[in-house]
UniProtKB/Swiss-Prot annotation:
Belongs to the protein kinase superfamily. CMGC Ser/Thr protein kinase family. CDC2/CDKX subfamily. ATP binds at I10, G11, E12, G13, T14, Y15, G16, V17, V18, K33. Residues 4-287 form the Protein kinase domain. This is Cell division control protein 2 homolog. The modification Phosphothreonine is found at T14, T161. It catalyses: L-seryl-[protein] + ATP = O-phospho-L-seryl-[protein] + ADP + H(+); L-threonyl-[protein] + ATP = O-phospho-L-threonyl-[protein] + ADP + H(+); [DNA-directed RNA polymerase] + ATP = phospho-[DNA-directed RNA polymerase] + ADP + H(+). Pfam families: Pkinase (PF00069). SUPFAM superfamilies: Protein kinase-like (PK-like) (SSF56112). Keywords: ATP-binding, Cell cycle, Cell division, Kinase, Mitosis, Nucleotide-binding, Phosphoprotein, Serine/threonine-protein kinase, Transferase. It comes from the Eukaryota.
Length: 294
């Protein structure tokens, strides 16, 4: 750890404290994540070390680069490139952002590009939210942070500071207890983020797993064997769920054009096997006039 000097604490992530720090060798500013593990006394599990080492191979313009992994005194530190703005802060500080459909389109395109890259390397995110989409103020390049960490460390119910980990972007198959989820869970999260960029408010802000599910079902309809084969066999599906019918998304996200609504419908498909892939979403007609994207 001697190579890095902490400058200031910049936040508390899902897994531990995040510092702005300086690389004493290159003088570069970096983000240093100190990972807090449940079994502090046992040190860092070798599985986590293996998973994290694989992430150093992931290099793409829309992914926050993991530059180094430091294992010292039973603690794990992850060294990332430093970006000081995230999509949540950006949306909160720019009320006019929603009035800029071109910017929303460019951000969405970059999110999907980063995800398609990760999925092509068989890496899931599982915890995508506006707070871990980082933005370079100079170029408006958007980069995904924390990819692959869920697999290495699991997703806690609460952070180490006892904050509740948000459910607002969690896919219905996870909420229904599926153990066999895959890449579609990330596409669902992106659909929620897309709607939030346009509406300037979260689409499904549930405060418990059941509240989250019911918010989803009230808008998209309660699934059944016809609309989602196999859904009634998922561990947490109950035949007693209220049977809501689906609403038209153009009424839910009124400021989005028809091509955008079509793409959103495909991303928010309840049945994960019918949900559009990130790769196919990039080819959607919504992006036909995209022009140059950083």
């Amino acid at each position: 750890m001697d190579q890095y000097e902490k400058v200031e604490k910049i936040g508390e992530g899902t897994y531990g404290v995040v510092y702005k720090a300086r690389d004493k060798v290159t003088n570069e500013t970096i983000a240093l994540k100190k990972i807090r593990l449940e079994q502090e006394d046992e040190g860092v599990p070798s599985t986590a070390i293996r998973e994290i080492s694989l992430l150093k191979e992931m290099q793409h313009g829309n992914i926050v680069r993991l530059q180094d992994v430091v294992h010292s005194e039973k603690r794990l530190y992850l060294v990332f490139e430093y970006l000081d703005l995230d999509l949540k802060k950006h949306m909160d500080s720019c009320p006019d952002f929603a009035k800029d459909p071109r910017m929303i389109k460019r951000f969405l395109y970059q999110i999907l590009r980063g995800i398609a890259y990760c999925h092509s390397h068989r890496v899931l995110h599982r915890d995508l939210k506006p707070q871990n989409l980082l933005i370079d103020r100079q170029t408006n390049a958007l980069k995904l942070a924390d990819f692959g960490l869920a697999r290495a460390f699991g997703i806690p119910v609460r952070t180490f500071t006892h904050e509740v980990v948000t459910l607002w972007y969690r896919a219905p198959e996870i909420l229904l207890g599926s153990r066999h989820y895959s890449t579609p869970v990330d596409v669902w999260s992106v659909g929620c983020i897309f709607a939030e960029m346009v509406n300037q408010k979260p689409l499904f802000p549930g405060d418990s797993e059941i509240d989250e599910l019911f918010k989803i079902f009230r808008t998209l309809g309660t699934p059944n064997e016809e609309t989602w084969p196999g859904v009634t066999s998922l561990p947490d599906f109950k035949s007693s769920f209220p049977k809501w019918i689906s609403k038209d998304l153009s009424a839910v996200v009124p400021n989005l054009d028809p091509a955008g609504i079509d793409l959103l419908n495909k991303m928010l498909c309840l049945d994960p096997s019918k949900r559009i892939t990130a790769r196919n979403a990039l080819e959607h007609e919504y992006f036909k006039d995209i022009g140059f994207v950083p």
